[in-house]
């Protein structure tokens, strides 16, 4: 096989034209884009997302239907702060949401009420960044998609304790009551509404319009109607009645109190059902006024429907009215007031648009399951649905149909960001609509406007609580680009409306055959969430209905269709009953299968079939895995458990100072970096005009039309982040890889850094590895490292910590940031500026002051010494205490940045603020004027000599008449905020340009407005800070961490270990040419772990290093043994990678050859510096008086129960007594012991430990009284 070269890598894939990967962030970006539909004009917006929320809640009317508030359109203004500002100031990156609302009056009495159209502010909404995240309170967050049960109908089966199979059908709506139909052990079918009261299914049928037994039996075609005559009935003697013979008569009753006569309908049963016709019965029937009777058919299929007859027997009702009353009583536990209210209950439950909604998905699933043809727009239940479900259940009972598999992906769908936001906005707008209605009712006679009615806080409070507290709104894992992209593509079965960890069984967590190409079978967390949190596969997309789809090529008559039409995305349901061939099945040049038998998949089987039987073919063997799993070369040679660890650990790799892309990759590394949006990418073709370490400037190519309609400069400036802190305290530090004068193309990556090199993912380093023990130091997966790794910064990373100190207003006065701190030496404050903030560049050691702050002390009587100090130094000296922020015991680093945010000083005179604000107004008004002049120039040029087709505003008032010439004067008079951008002229091209110019003008105008608002706020209010906080200081400290003993490292195959020893270069084992190896791994870690991929990688990468080439070996379609042998032979290396090594200490050759190669190793985020902790004295728990636990609390170790047992076993009673009392929580005893030690006195008798007091109080709380003697 001849390998192909792409992107500087030699690719071993057998498929030469695989499908291009879809955008990896499409899940997030498309969903949010579809939710807002900002690029779509209002009249063309689909009824989905935000538009649908407005459509569902508007128009709003008051209770008398006098006033109507109608929704016309919504739009958003530019954000107040940039993403960078939000991150550094701890703010939310949001945009103001505004709606154009129209208020009018329908009541002729209110003639003076004019129709009002206003833009109403509905609150700020968090806005997604270009990389699919949200910035909430200064931290990047991700909304994880949720995998939940699809709305629709589900048929299930359970086993009763006596062995009877019970069947059920459950209808799950998008919103509204659940209804379940189930059989019981007596072969009777019941309906359960909201899992509460049960009623026979025939009662429900009567209540929805199938009143008589005849109507019910006719649904299933079960009864034969016989006209009542003596001759007819005589013929039928011996046959059983299928329905009751009833006699209906009117009974007049007089009310005892009022004497009023009330007519009551009475029903008497003449002959019950299931009774044989006899001479006596015939007489009774003839005497009643019945016209026809129903008899059992003689057909054979009636036995299948015995459940209906059994249910009719249990049914207490005989008419629709009785059934409605029965349902009402069951649900409400009360008697209905009248027939209408009884009917209303059942109508509201399932047949009302307001209360019940199956959603697009629910209707689609029910139609598909029951082969119905009901209009997709009907989102409520219909009688037809209920009848078909009952029929299907009867088929189930008779073993003529099968139950649903709840874990099948056709029964589970994905709630993406857009849908979750739609639900939240739905809640917020519904609340807002209520308050609007209340305000309308209150302000009946006043003149009011939409702004008076709407309360903007309602929506933003719901949305903010969703982003801040919802389980699916998660703090983004930002350790490296892979961690980011994986987090955004994650699917969780947990969260509101999903499963809970405790209730989820094995089946839900297990891999299902429908996961193929949709959900990754490998990447999932270890631990309690296993199988509940999964990742999307590389080619998977989410359909409009929320089902996960995967692409296949169509195969017709044994020939694969490689055209664009032949490629289709299939949901799990569409893939059912299809035979799918593997992606790397051998084909000839015409796309026909070479072999007579083809390996294929058919649902959960793997048959060998003839080419003609194949329906579809995988697009690529990579399609089965997620991004992280697809990054592991030779994945096919690894055990699944280790592959799982490998894909999870790559997400924990810290970005290195000098990263290197792997010699052996899988070909997906470049695509990942591009789609992660972490690097700066050229938007289109252009030329680099300026480059330095902090910014890149590019002049983009523009067409004449683009140049004309744009108000932007052609040169775009990109600023590069330098040592920016991530959520996980790793760093993003980008540097340019383009030069001045370079031509760039659209999509070209212009920078590297943050775990990338040359536009490819670079999580670690390629190191020379030997699989051999080294003096026992690599026992139990430990790793022996060459000192060169430390010296040459192979695994050095930079970590940035942020330290914050807030200045508050306290009851005793204002706190203050200062370097003048009481009782602190000058030496300790030498690096602080006048605000008490440490200078940039200062080296920090444990205990150093980072931010100096003083706080007013409590007013208690001063001691004589304090009185003297106050007399000498004035009032200031004694009334403040040191409240500075000091470096923690393990903090060592360099200050790289400091920030100080302050609210505007109150002392500023009002006049100076007014002056500044009016100057700002002038400056920005001038900018708006210039922008408007440029707009008029452009429009005048466009419309020169053109006849106008009419220019209208939102109220359809004609501002420029049709047929007139467009003059500059006319154009200057237009307000572009209220005009409709419909066709102004007869020329389509001109109209397009006019629209583009106007849209660009409005965008710039709004940006200028937002900037002005922002500047005014800065002048009047200062920085936005939470309530009660006057100032906030931030210090950023960078720590350079070299690899050291105790750090965790791993390869890509789940081969993890802890560095146990760093050995001098000359002591490491070396190759025959004198090259010392970089790392020694224990060979015993390979056989039991069954991750042989690492050996393949090591051998191939060694050849790659020797030949100075890089390889791509895609998973399940990578390098074969022959390919590897070819490259090892070219490089002059042993085919099996085994070679003799020499002892660094003695120079002797080792007895056996060892496997040597080059492996890609990562340094993980579990570093010993973060874990190392020791305490002598520190904080105690208030209640038990014992030391706190954990590094974060600076806690200590406790002498626990098992340690006490050890001392007891040795009989060390005095030591034990000391440990449990004076050395622990005997508060009085320990201070006395301290005194005794200081004075040299004998130790006092121990007292009562505090923990015993706690126990005594607990017992007293239980009502037990006792005393200690």
UniProtKB/Swiss-Prot annotation:
Record protein name field: DNA-directed RNA polymerase subunit beta
Keyword Transcription: yes
Database matches in PROSITE patterns: RNA_POL_BETA (PS01166)
A GO MF label: ribonucleoside binding
Gene this protein is translated from: rpoB
Gene3D superfamilies: 2.40.50.100, 2.40.50.150, 3.90.1100.10, DNA-directed RNA polymerase, beta subunit, external 1 domain, DNA-directed RNA polymerase, subunit 2, domain 6, RNA polymerase alpha subunit dimerisation domain
Coiled coil: none
Protein family: Belongs to the RNA polymerase beta chain family.
Matching Pfam families: RNA_pol_Rpb2_1, RNA_pol_Rpb2_2, RNA_pol_Rpb2_3, RNA_pol_Rpb2_45, RNA_pol_Rpb2_6, RNA_pol_Rpb2_7
Entry-linked CDD domains: RNA_pol_B_RPB2
One of the record's GO cellular component terms: DNA-directed RNA polymerase complex
Transmembrane region(s): none
């Amino acid at each position: 096989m001849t390998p192909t070269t792409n992107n500087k890598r030699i690719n071993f894939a057998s498929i030469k034209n695989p499908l291009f990967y879809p955008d990896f962030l499409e899940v997030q970006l498309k969903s949010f884009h579809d939710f807002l539909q900002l690029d779509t004009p209002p009249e063309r917006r689909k009824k989905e997302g935000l538009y649908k929320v407005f459509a569902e809640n508007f128009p709003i009317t008051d209770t008398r239907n006098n006033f109507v508030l109608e929704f016309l359109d919504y739009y958003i203004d530019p954000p107040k702060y940039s993403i960078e500002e939000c991150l550094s100031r701890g703010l939310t990156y949001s945009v103001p949401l505004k709606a154009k609302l129209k208020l009018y009056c329908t009541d002729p009495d209110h003639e003076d009420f004019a129709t009002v159209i206003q833009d109403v502010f509905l609150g700020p909404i968090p806005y997604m960044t270009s990389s699919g995240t949200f910035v909430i309170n200064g931290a990047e967050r991700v909304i994880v998609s949720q995998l939940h049960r699809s709305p629709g109908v589900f048929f299930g089966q359970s086993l009763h304790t006596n062995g009877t199979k019970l069947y059920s059908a459950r209808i799950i709506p998008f919103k509204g009551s659940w209804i379940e139909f189930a059989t019981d052990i007596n072969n009777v079918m019941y309906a359960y509404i909201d899992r509460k009261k049960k009623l026979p299914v025939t009662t429900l049928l009567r209540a929805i319009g199938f009143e008589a037994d005849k109507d019910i039996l006719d649904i299933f075609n079960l009864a034969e109607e016989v006209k009542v005559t003596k001759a007819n009935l005589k013929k039928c003697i011996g046959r059983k009645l299928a329905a009751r013979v009833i006699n209906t008569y009117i009974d007049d009753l007089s009310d005892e109190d009022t004497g009023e006569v009330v007519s009551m309908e009475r029903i008497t049963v003449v002959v019950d059902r299931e009774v044989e016709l006899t001479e006596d019965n015939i007489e009774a029937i003839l005497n009643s006024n019945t016209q026809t009777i129903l008899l059992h058919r003689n057909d054979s299929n009636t036995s299948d429907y015995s459940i209906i007859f059994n249910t009719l027997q249990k049914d207490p009702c005989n008419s629709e009215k009785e059934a409605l009353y029965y349902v009402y009583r069951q649900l409400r536990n009360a008697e209905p007031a009248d027939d209408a209210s009884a009917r209303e209950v059942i109508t509201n439950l399932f047949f009302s648009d307001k209360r019940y909604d199956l959603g697009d998905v629910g209707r689609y699933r029910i139609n598909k399951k029951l082969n119905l043809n009901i209009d997709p727009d009907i989102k409520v239940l219909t009688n037809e649905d209920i009848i078909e479900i009952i029929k299907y259940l009867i088929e189930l009972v008779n073993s003529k149909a099968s139950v649903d598999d709840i874990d099948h992906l056709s029964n589970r769908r994905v709630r993406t960001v857009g849908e979750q936001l739609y639900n939240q906005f739905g809640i917020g707008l519904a609340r807002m609509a209520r308050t609007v209605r209340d305000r309308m009712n209150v302000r009946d006679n006043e003149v009011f406007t939409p702004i008076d009615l709407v309360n903007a806080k309602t929506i933003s409070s719901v949305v903010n609580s969703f982003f801040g507290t919802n389980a699916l709104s998660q703090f983004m894992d930002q350790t490296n680009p892979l961690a980011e992209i994986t987090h955004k593509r994650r699917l969780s079965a947990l969260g509101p409306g999903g499963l809970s960890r405790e209730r989820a069984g094995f089946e839900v967590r297990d891999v299902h055959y429908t996961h193929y190409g949709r959900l990754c079978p490998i990447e999932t967390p270890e631990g309690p969430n296993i199988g509940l949190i999964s990742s999307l596969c590389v080619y998977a997309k989410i359909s409009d209905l929320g089902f996960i789809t995967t692409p296949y090529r169509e195969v017709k008559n044994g020939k694969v269709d490689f055209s664009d039409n032949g490629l289709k995305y299939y949901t799990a349901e569409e893939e059912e009953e299809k035979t799918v061939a593997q992606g790397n099945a051998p084909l000839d040049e015409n796309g026909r299968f070479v072999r007579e038998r083809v390996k294929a998949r058919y649902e959960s089987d793997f048959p060998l079939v003839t080419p003609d039987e194949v329906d579809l073919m995988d697009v690529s063997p990579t399609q089965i895995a997620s991004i992280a799993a697809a990054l592991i070369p030779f994945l096919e040679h690894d055990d699944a458990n280790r592959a799982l660890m490998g894909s999870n650990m790559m997400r924990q790799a810290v970005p290195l100072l000098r990263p290197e892309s792997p010699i052996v990759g899988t070909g997906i590394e470049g695509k990942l970096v591009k789609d992660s949006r972490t690097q700066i990418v050229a938007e289109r073709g252009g030329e680099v005009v300026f480059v330095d370490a902090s910014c890149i400037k590019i002049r983009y190519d523009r067409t004449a039309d683009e140049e004309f309609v744009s108000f932007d400069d052609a040169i775009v400036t990109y600023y590069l982040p330098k040592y920016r802190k991530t959520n996980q305290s790793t760093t993003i530090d980008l540097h340019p890889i383009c030069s001045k004068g370079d031509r760039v193309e659209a999509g070209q990556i212009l920078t590297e850094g943050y775990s990338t090199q040359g536009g490819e993912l670079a999580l670690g380093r390629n190191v020379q590895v030997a699989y051999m023990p080294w003096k026992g130091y690599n026992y139990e997966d430990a790793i022996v490292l060459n000192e060169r790794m430390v010296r040459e910064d192979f695994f050095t990373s930079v970590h940035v910590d942020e330290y914050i100190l807030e200045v508050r207003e306290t009851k005793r006065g204002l706190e203050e940031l200062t370097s003048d701190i009481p009782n602190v030496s000058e030496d300790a404050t030498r690096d602080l500026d006048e605000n008490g903030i440490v200078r940039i560049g200062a080296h920090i050691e444990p205990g150093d002051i980072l931010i100096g702050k003083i706080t007013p002390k409590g007013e208690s009587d001063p001691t004589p010494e304090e009185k003297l100090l106050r007399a000498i130094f004035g009032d200031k000296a004694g009334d403040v205490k040191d409240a500075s922020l000091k470096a923690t015991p393990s903090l060592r680093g360099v200050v790289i940045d400091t920030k100080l945010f302050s609210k505007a000083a109150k002392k500023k005179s009002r006049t100076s603020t007014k002056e500044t604000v009016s100057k700002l107004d002038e400056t920005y008004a001038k900018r708006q004027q210039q922008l408007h002049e440029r707009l008029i120039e452009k429009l005048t040029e466009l419309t020169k000599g053109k006849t106008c087709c009419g220019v209208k505003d939102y109220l359809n008032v004609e501002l420029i008449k049709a047929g007139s010439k467009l003059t500059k004067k006319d154009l200057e008079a237009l307000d572009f905020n209220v005009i409709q951008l419909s066709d102004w002229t007869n020329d389509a091209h001109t109209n397009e340009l006019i629209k583009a110019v106007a849209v660009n003008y409005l965008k710039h105008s709004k940006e200028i407005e937002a900037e002005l608002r922002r500047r005014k706020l800065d002048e009047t209010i200062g920085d936005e800070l939470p309530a009660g906080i006057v100032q906030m200081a931030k210090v950023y400290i960078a720590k350079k961490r070299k690899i050291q003993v105790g750090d965790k490292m791993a390869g890509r195959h789940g081969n993890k270990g802890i560095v146990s020893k760093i050995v001098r270069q000359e002591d490491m084992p070396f190759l025959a040419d004198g090259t010392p190896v970089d790392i020694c791994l224990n060979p015993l870690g390979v056989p039991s772990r069954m991750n042989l991929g690492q050996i393949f990688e090591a051998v191939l990468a060694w050849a790659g290093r020797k030949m100075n080439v890089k390889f791509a070996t895609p998973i399940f379609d990578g390098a074969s043994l022959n390919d590897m042998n070819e490259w090892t032979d070219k490089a002059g290396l042993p085919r099996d990678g085994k070679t003799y090594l020499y002892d660094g200490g003695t120079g002797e050759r080792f007895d056996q050859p060892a496997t040597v190669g080059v492996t890609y190793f990562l340094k993980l985020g579990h570093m010993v510096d973060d874990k190392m902790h020791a305490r002598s004295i520190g904080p105690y728990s208030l209640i038990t008086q014992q030391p706190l636990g954990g590094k974060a609390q600076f806690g200590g170790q406790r002498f626990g129960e098992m340690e006490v047992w050890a001392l007891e076993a040795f009989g060390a009673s005095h030591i034990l007594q000391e440990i449990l009392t004076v050395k622990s929580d005997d508060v009085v005893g320990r201070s006395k012991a301290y005194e005794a030690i200081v004075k040299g006195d004998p130790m006092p008798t121990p007292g009562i430990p505090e923990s015993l007091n706690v126990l005594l109080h607990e017992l007293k709380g239980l009502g037990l009284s006792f005393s200690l003697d």
